[in-house]
């Protein structure tokens, strides 16, 4: 039996501990989600990949924002370096 997931998986509280603010977390996750979307567009078109694909395992029905948040939760991304940009 599959474990029930909440509305936000991973929980937002655990993600906030990795970011200095809610605003920073939202901006960073949204940027990463757009990169993931663009990766799949490039993959479909057969063009050169300008973006890195998902760094975590992905199910077919996962949205790019969910994938981005899971990457943050699993420490696959460094939020500190993006704050300087």
From Swiss-Prot:
GO-annotated cellular components: DNA-directed RNA polymerase complex
Xref: SUPFAM superfamilies: RPB6/omega subunit-like
GO biological process: DNA-templated transcription
Keyword Transferase: yes
Enzyme class: transferase
Single Gene Ontology MF annotation: DNA-directed RNA polymerase activity
Reaction(s) the record says it catalyses: RNA(n) + a ribonucleoside 5'-triphosphate = RNA(n+1) + diphosphate
E.C. code: 2.7.7.6
One matching Pfam family: RNA_pol_Rpb6
Entry-linked InterPro entries: DNA-dir_RNA_pol_omega, Pol_omega/Rpo6/RPB6, RPB6/omega-like_sf
Keywords for this protein: DNA-directed RNA polymerase, Nucleotidyltransferase, Transcription, Transferase
Function: Promotes RNA polymerase assembly. Latches the N- and C-terminal regions of the beta' subunit thereby facilitating its interaction with the beta and alpha subunits.
HAMAP family per record: RNApol_bact_RpoZ (MF_00366)
Quaternary data: The RNAP catalytic core consists of 2 alpha, 1 beta, 1 beta' and 1 omega subunit. When a sigma factor is associated with the core the holoenzyme is formed, which can initiate transcription.
PANTHER family, sorted: DNA-DIRECTED RNA POLYMERASE SUBUNIT OMEGA (PTHR34476:SF1)
Family in the record: Belongs to the RNA polymerase subunit omega family.
Name listed for the protein in its UniProt record: DNA-directed RNA polymerase subunit omega
Naturally occurring in which organism (per UniProt): Tropheryma whipplei (strain TW08/27) (Whipple's bacillus)
């Amino acid at each position: 039996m599959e474990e029930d997931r909440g509305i936000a998986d991973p929980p937002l509280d655990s993600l906030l501990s990795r970011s200095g603010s809610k605003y920073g977390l939202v901006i960073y996750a949204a940027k990463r989600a757009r990169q993931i979307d663009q990766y799949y567009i490039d993959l479909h078109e057969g063009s050169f990949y300008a973006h890195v694909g998902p760094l975590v395992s992905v199910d077919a029905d996962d949205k790019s924002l969910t994938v981005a948040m899971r990457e943050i939760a699993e420490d696959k991304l460094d939020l500190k370096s993006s704050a300087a940009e």
